[in-house]
């Protein structure tokens, strides 16, 4: 009888240890899938591989990975010049994404991380409501400039990536590019990040943009036309 009790206790302990080991293994796999150990230096995207004459941007997001965006200077020339200028000066390096509304937008580019900051100037809004022809639709993957409702010319550095289609934004905001690679990175952010304020989409923890690189494909672009604040 005593030997039977000892056998049962040993069997139970082995079962508990086995379950604990499986649990830890699952957590490790989950972290790997999310890119928790992502290293921008060893996972740098080769931008020359993208067959386009338009500028191509690689944005490296901490804990997730890279997103590649093609810019459309023929659609919104000054908006693209502004984005290029901010990238070349390192403005977006260690900047953040601060806002997420699943199925709608992922927004970033504010140096304060609050949704109220910018580069210290604004640019003219290149969209129909501001007497500028821009027919790029706000569909999934499109990148567009954020602005305040106070004026059409209040965009600066904040931008948003469309997570779905929003026709009511067409003609009201300056769409200027599209995500062409790394959409899995965006999907993982959308699925796994915690939203602190459901009304505004403010993230509990802002996502760091570790580094942003650009390939101009051998072309030169005009200096950005600024509206000084």
Roles of regions detected by a PLM:
Residues 2-3, 7, 18-229:
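Cyclophilin-like peptidyl-prolyl cis-trans isomerases
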Residues 10-15:
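Hydrophobic helical h-region of N-terminal Sec-dependent signal peptides
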């Amino acid at each position: 009888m005593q030997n039977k009790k000892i056998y049962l206790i040993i069997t139970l302990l082995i079962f508990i240890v086995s379950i604990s080991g499986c649990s830890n293994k699952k957590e490790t796999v989950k972290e790997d899938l999310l890119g928790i150990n992502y290293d921008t230096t060893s996972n740098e995207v080769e931008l020359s591989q993208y067959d386009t004459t338009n500028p191509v941007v690689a944005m490296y997001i901490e804990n997730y990975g890279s997103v590649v965006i093609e810019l459309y200077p023929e659609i919104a020339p000054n908006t693209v010049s502004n984005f290029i200028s901010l990238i070349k000066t390192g403005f977006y390096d260690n900047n953040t994404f601060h806002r997420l509304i699943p199925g709608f937008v992922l927004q970033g580019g504010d140096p304060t991380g609050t949704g109220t900051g910018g580069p210290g100037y604004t640019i003219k809004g290149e969209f129909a409501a501001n007497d500028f022809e821009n027919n790029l639709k706000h569909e999934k993957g499109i990148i567009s400039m954020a602005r305040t409702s106070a004026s059409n010319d209040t965009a600066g550095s904040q931008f948003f990536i469309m997570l779905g289609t929003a026709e009511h934004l067409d003609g009201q905001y300056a769409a200027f590019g599209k995500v062409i690679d790394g959409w899995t990175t965006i999907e993982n952010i959308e699925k796994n990040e915690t939203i602190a304020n459901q009304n505004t989409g403010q993230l509990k923890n802002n996502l760091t943009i570790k580094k942003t690189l650009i390939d101009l494909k051998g072309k030169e672009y005009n200096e950005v036309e600024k509206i000084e604040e």
